[in-house]
């Protein structure tokens, strides 16, 4: 085991929320993030219907179930298979949350439109700040788009976002679809993490506008460019140049979209 691996194991052993989750049979320390977010913003209530986007490994499914109780209902969606949980009011679907057939499958399972949509999903991490920020925004914007397709009017939304240049513009975008938008970092988030949670309270019923002039929406059109600049061959070249080329290309991409 290398020094980095040993350091990671030691850090986890000393992690309060990791140990707490393990003792209480929660699948992830992130379970406590949702508990803390809900305590502060009253997002989920007893008997609510909840959809969890990017639900693997199931920590937020467990937290949501503890809050809604046996009379609530939760559907999770993830590209990975999620090990079943011992509750008949939790169902996890394997699939892409942006695909209409997967959304239809989720809607068909729900007893009614969801009261709350939650998303703690993370993109694949490259280790390059600008790239990870763009990937995070692409993922969270797709989550917002999905929320506007599914939420009942007056419903709530919470999503994890990585901080960066366009973070405030994402918050502004969320505020177009909800009466109030908030940002917060729960106690269970690690101090060194760039993650922040964006909360939308009381969905106004407006459908997602793909023709919006928001630079965040425009990012959804940049996937081919992003794939190009993060390809293994270019990453190898970039690592020799201290990642400068990658950062330059992403900034060029942003300026064109703005």
Curated annotation (Swiss-Prot):
Q: Does the keyword Transferase apply?
A: yes
InterPro entries for this protein: RNA_methyltr_RlmE (IPR050082), RNA_MeTrfase_FtsJ_dom (IPR002877), rRNA-MeTfrase_E (IPR015507), SAM-dependent_MTases_sf (IPR029063)
Q: Which UniProt keywords apply?
A: Cytoplasm, Methyltransferase, rRNA processing, S-adenosyl-L-methionine, Transferase
Q: Where does S-adenosyl-L-methionine bind?
A: 58, 60, 78, 96, 120
Which Gene Ontology molecular-function terms are recorded?
A: rRNA (uridine-2'-O-)-methyltransferase activity
A cellular component annotation (GO) from this entry: cytoplasm
* Keyword set includes Ubl conjugation: no
State the active site: 160 (proton acceptor)
- Catalytic activity field: uridine(2552) in 23S rRNA + S-adenosyl-L-methionine = 2'-O-methyluridine(2552) in 23S rRNA + S-adenosyl-L-homocysteine + H(+)
Q: Where in the cell is the protein located?
A: Cytoplasm
Q: Entry's PANTHER family?
A: PRE-RRNA 2'-O-RIBOSE RNA METHYLTRANSFERASE FTSJ3, RIBOSOMAL RNA METHYLTRANSFERASE
Q: Which family does it belong to?
A: Belongs to the class I-like SAM-binding methyltransferase superfamily. RNA methyltransferase RlmE family.
Q: What does the UniProt record say this protein does?
A: Specifically methylates the uridine in position 2552 of 23S rRNA at the 2'-O position of the ribose in the fully assembled 50S ribosomal subunit.
User: What protein name applies here?
Assistant: Ribosomal RNA large subunit methyltransferase E
This protein's species is: Methanococcus maripaludis (strain DSM 14266 / JCM 13030 / NBRC 101832 / S2 / LL)
């Amino acid at each position: 085991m290398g020094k980095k691996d040993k350091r990671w194991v030691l850090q986890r052993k000393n992690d309060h929320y990791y140990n707490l989750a393990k003792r209480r049979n929660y699948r992830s320390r992130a379970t406590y993030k949702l508990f803390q977010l809900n305590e502060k913003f009253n997002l989920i209530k007893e008997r609510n219907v909840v959809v969890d986007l990017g639900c693997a490994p199931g920590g937020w499914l467990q937290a949501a179930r503890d809050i809604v109780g046996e009379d609530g209902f939760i559907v999770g969606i993830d590209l990975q298979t999620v090990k079943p949980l011992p509750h008949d009011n939790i169902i996890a679907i394997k699939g892409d949350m942006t695909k209409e057939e997967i959304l239809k499958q989720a809607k068909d399972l729900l007893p009614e439109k969801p009261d709350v949509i939650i998303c703690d999903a993370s993109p694949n991490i490259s280790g390059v700040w600008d790239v990870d920020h763009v990937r995070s925004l692409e993922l969270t914007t797709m989550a917002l788009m999905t929320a506007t397709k599914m939420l009942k009017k007056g419903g709530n939304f919470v999503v994890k976002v990585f901080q960066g240049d366009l973070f405030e513009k994402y918050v502004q975008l969320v505020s177009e679809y909800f009466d109030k938008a908030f940002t917060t970092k729960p106690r269970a988030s690690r101090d060194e993490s760039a993650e922040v949670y964006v909360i939308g309270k009381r969905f106004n019923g407006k459908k997602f506008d793909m023709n919006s002039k928001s630079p965040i929406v425009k990012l959804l059109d940049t996937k081919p460019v992003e794939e190009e600049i993060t390809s293994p061959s270019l990453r190898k070249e970039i690592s020799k140049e201290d990642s400068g080329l990658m950062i330059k290309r992403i900034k060029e991409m942003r300026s064109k979209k703005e």
